[in-house]
Amino acid sequence: VADKIDWYLANPLTRRERRLGRSPSAWARSFACEDVSVLIVCRGPIRMEAMDVLDEMGVARYGILLSDKDSIVYQQARAPELRRMDAARVHRVRDYSGATTAERAERVADIVAICKAHGYGYVFAGYGFMAESADFVAALEDAGLRFIGPCSHTQRAAGSKDEAKRTALAQGVS
C-alpha cells in the first residue's frame, strides 16, 4: 500500500520555509522579521490566520487584543487561538472602537498604551473598521508604532473614490 500524501502539507505554494532569516541569500535575509513584535487587533479566523502566518515567519513575540465582549464569549467558545496563547500576551480593552468620537480616541489611546507597555512595535488589524481607519493608523504612527498595512496618508488618499483614482493614475497602477 502506497503512503498517503497530505497534499496541503506537501504543497510548496502554501507550505514552505517562511523564516527569511534562515535563507542562504543575504538579500532574502535582509527581509527577515523574526525580531518584530506585533499586537493583533482583529477577531476570530482572521486573528487565527495572522497568528499562523507570524508563527510560520518565525515571529515569536506577538499578542492579541480582546474586547470585553470577546473575553466573555471566547471563554465559553474555547477559541483555539486562546488555548495556545500565554495569558500574558492576551490584552483587553472595553471595546475595539467605541460608540462616540471621544470613546474612539480613548480606545486608540488604550491600544497605544498596551503596545508601549508590552513592547509591541507593530499593529496588525486584519481588515474592516479599524484597518481602514486613517485616524487609527495616524494615531499609531504619531505614537511611533508601525501599522501593518497602508499608511494613514494612503488610506486618506484612497478614502474618496475620485482621489483614489487620481492616486492610482499618478502611481501608474490604473
Regions found by a protein language model. Give the residues of each.
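N-terminal beta-alpha lobe that positions the nucleotide/phosphoryl donor
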Residues: 1-174
